[in-house]
Amino acid sequence: MMARRDPTSWAKRLVRAQTLQKQRRAPVGPRAPPPDEEDPRLKCKNCGAFGHTARSTRCPMKCWKAALVPATLGKKEGKENLKPWKPRGEANPGPLNKDKGEKEERPRQQDPQRKALLHMFSGKPPEKPLPNGKGSTEPSDYLRVASGPMPVHTTSKRPRLDPVLADRSATEMSGRGSVLASLSPLRKASLSSSSSLGPKERQTGAAADMPQPAVRHQGREPLLVVKPTHSRPEGGCREVPQAASKTHGLLQAARPQAQDKRPAVTSQPCPPAATHSLGLGSNLSFGPGAKRPAQAPIQACLNFPKKPRLGPFQIPESAIQGGELGAPENLQPPPAATELGPSTSPQMGRRTPAQVPSVDRQPPHSRPCLPTAQACTMSHHPAASHDGAQPLRVLFRRLENGRWSSSLLAAPSFHSPEKPGAFLAQSPHVSEKSEAPCVRVPPSVLYEDLQVSSSSEDSDSDLE
């Protein structure tokens, strides 16, 4: 029985068993398609095409020789230029180009007629023909010959204004200048006066805006009218007696010999002109010996805008005249002063030269004269003027342009020979030197005394 079995059949069975085992060991999943088949669900990672994987031999990235150029799906005539590198020549134009050429030749023939009509109506010269002398059939000819001027935009040039706008801007500028010129007339007048006048008349010209005081004479006795250039309420009016007393003492120490030669004359300064214009009837009389008098009535000053304050080196004219006329010992108000109002300042004692600081520290002519007051009259008292000397007058005139001009005049003498001792009887404190004849003071002496007083005031302010 064993011999009847065929060995070939046994071998076939082993091959079948091995194939079954291989099939069982294989993983469960989709089976790879054969190489001839393409699966659209697959995508190659190398070339990005669908239908094969990166391991397939159909991928063109692995075998370039087998790669084929992808063909189009279908031809679309009339939308694609199959041969763009071959431009059509002018020798053999196509049918479409022939039609276009005929349409272009027709309007070109009408151009000369149009140009002639335009030349007749507009008067412009005819355009010159092209130098080549043949019609331009190239498509880029319209770029070479422009039909009209092209606008050129530049940022460097400024646009021109209309004449109406220019006139308006000019009127606005002139209006602004006139408004600025009319804003501060006080400041303009003070600047023009200070620039035109000399060093002697600058500070007097600064008071051109204040009203000019009038000289008031009561009875036979002339009064000294002093107008300070810079008025200040309360504090500014109280500084005047102190400067007056200080100047009297300095002048006494500087010129002791002049006091021996000249008699002591009692002079009465008139109150400032603002009291007359405001209607105040109070008289101010200051003594030369005291630093500050007793409570004097405060002058009602006009509050002008932006006026500089009275400096320490500026000396009123009333203090200067008192020292020039012989250093009066006491000041007694005349009977005419009682008519204006009660005098509240008491009589001050004489200040000795020992109490006055020396003036030899500074030369007298080191600084030019800076007068700060405008004196209308400068005269001796009529009771003491026995030699016939005439008083001095300073005349101030206001010009058309707002400036001031001053001139020194000799006024007629105010003598009272009928009653030579009338005023001397009323003032019991007059010294024995008043019996001597009065000596006339020349203007040069007054100018030197004013320089001495200004230099001494500067030295005192520096020491303080």
UniProtKB/Swiss-Prot annotation:
Residues 1-42, 69-389, 411-437 are annotated as: Disordered. It holds the Pfam family zf-CCHC_6. Residues 74-89, 97-114 have a biased composition (Basic and acidic residues). Residues 180-197 have a biased composition (Low complexity). InterPro entries: FAM90, Znf-CCHC_6. Belongs to the FAM90 family. Primate-specific FAM90A gene family, thought to have arisen during multiple duplication and rearrangement events. This is Protein FAM90A13. It comes from Homo sapiens (Human).
